[in-house]
């Protein structure tokens, strides 16, 4: 999977710009606040129909403009395909092959990306919410079924929380509606939990040998999925559903008193253990960086296995955060197989030989100077 061209109109600090992309490595050089990260963000946004930096799409529109447009031509095993995202202050529109997609679940997955930025260290040391978002973003790119199940779960969760709040405030008395919502809630909670558990298992199988290679077999990495709803995965679907319903039924009064759902995938977490110790609590900064790097490289391999093509890798000012050995391991792993976009303030310290003669672009005040 390669991005041949990227065209932006009124995106962030860009007026109109076209980037003809190198199939291997593209290095975007420039001082801070010139637009390097905006370019990477536009590729991410084109892939996932949302930015990783803001939840407000209006911020993506250039100052004093009415709209923003991102368009990319994608090469993949079946040929080429244009993807378009049009953003206005009222909403957004996405197209595949010039055909509008009515649902984002139909759109996401055509262009797969893996982003690695300094803030991705928060996957290890940050809050559970960050790790849940990590699962949803990566798993959502390779499974439209998961995206749909997650959307249904979030819809029912919102309805259930609204009803619990009304019960707490005494605006509602009837628990029958809560029981109905719990039934629907349990069904999609089980589906989301099942898919997350499988994803973490697959990711761990790929991350373990990568981590061992980076540390010269001195450290062993393990990933542990910590679901809020704990049930026996070996049971059949009906038995698992019954087990979840039992948990929800036993805690119905607690949830009513609190006015919020206390159990479900929205409260899941993951732990990353290095040599049997929780990396979030006990890991050094170096161990946390190695863990994050191992996870990102495992994501790349997992997407290739599931989709049949390597994703595009976005490295946002991250090489400066890695020491020489980690940087070399990253670059040697991706060379010749993963199209990569790198932002940096300087090419000093980047091994050009390993990066296979990259194409350099200088970014200055929203303009690309080759």
From Swiss-Prot:
InterPro entries, A to Z: DNA-binding_RecF (IPR001238), DNA-binding_RecF_CS (IPR018078), P-loop_NTPase (IPR027417), RecF/RecN/SMC_N (IPR003395), RecF_2 (IPR042174)
Bilayer-crossing regions: none
GO CC annotation terms, alphabetical: cytoplasm
Pfam families from the UniProt entry: SMC_N (PF02463)
GO biological process: DNA replication; DNA synthesis involved in DNA repair; double-strand break repair; SOS response
Subcellular location: Cytoplasm
Keyword Transit peptide attached: no
Ligand binding (ATP): 30-37
SUPFAM superfamilies (UniProt xref): P-loop containing nucleoside triphosphate hydrolases
Family as reported in the entry's similarity comment: Belongs to the RecF family.
Cross-referenced HAMAP family: RecF
Its biological purpose: The RecF protein is involved in DNA metabolism; it is required for DNA replication and normal SOS inducibility. RecF binds preferentially to single-stranded, linear DNA. It also seems to bind ATP.
Descriptive protein name: DNA replication and repair protein RecF
């Amino acid at each position: 999977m390669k991005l041949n061209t990227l065209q932006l109109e009124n995106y962030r600090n860009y007026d109109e710009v076209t980037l003809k992309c190198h199939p291997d490595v593209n290095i975007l050089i420039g001082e801070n606040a010139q637009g390097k990260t905006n370019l990477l963000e536009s590729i991410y946004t084109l892939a996932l129909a949302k930015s990783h930096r803001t939840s407000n799409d209006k911020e993506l529109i250039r100052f004093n403009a009415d709209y923003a447009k991102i368009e990319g031509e994608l090469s993949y095993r079946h040929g080429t395909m244009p993807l378009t995202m049009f953003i206005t202050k009222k909403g957004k529109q996405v197209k595949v092959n010039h055909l509008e997609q009515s649902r984002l679940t139909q759109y996401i997955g055509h262009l797969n990306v893996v982003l690695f930025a300094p803030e991705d260290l928060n996957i290890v040391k940050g809050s559970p919410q960050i790790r849940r978002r990590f699962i949803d973003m990566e798993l959502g790119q390779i499974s439209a079924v998961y995206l749909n199940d997650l959307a249904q779960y979030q819809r029912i969760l919102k309805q259930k929380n609204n009803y619990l709040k009304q019960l707490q405030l005494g605006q509602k008395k009837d628990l029958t509606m809560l029981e109905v919502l719990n039934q629907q809630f349990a069904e999609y909670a089980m589906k989301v939990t099942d898919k997350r558990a499988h994803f973490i298992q697959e990711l761990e199988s790929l991350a373990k040998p990568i981590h061992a290679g980076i540390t010269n077999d001195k450290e062993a990495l393990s990933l542990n999925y910590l679901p809020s709803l704990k049930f026996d995965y070996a049971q059949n679907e009906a038995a698992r559903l019954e087990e979840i319903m039992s948990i929800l039924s036993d805690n119905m009064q607690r949830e009513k008193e609190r006015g919020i759902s206390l159990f479900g995938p929205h409260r899941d977490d993951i732990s990353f253990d290095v040599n049997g110790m929780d990396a979030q609590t006990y890991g050094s900064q170096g161990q946390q960086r190695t863990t994050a790097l191992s996870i990102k490289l495992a994501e790349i391999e997992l997407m290739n296995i599931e989709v049949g093509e390597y994703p595009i890798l976005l490295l946002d000012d991250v090489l400066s955060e890695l020491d020489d050995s980690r940087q070399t391991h990253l670059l040697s792993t991706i060379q010749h197989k993963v199209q990569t976009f790198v932002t940096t303030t300087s090419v000093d310290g980047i091994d050009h030989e390993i990066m296979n003669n990259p194409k350099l672009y200088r970014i200055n005040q929203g303009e690309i100077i080759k």
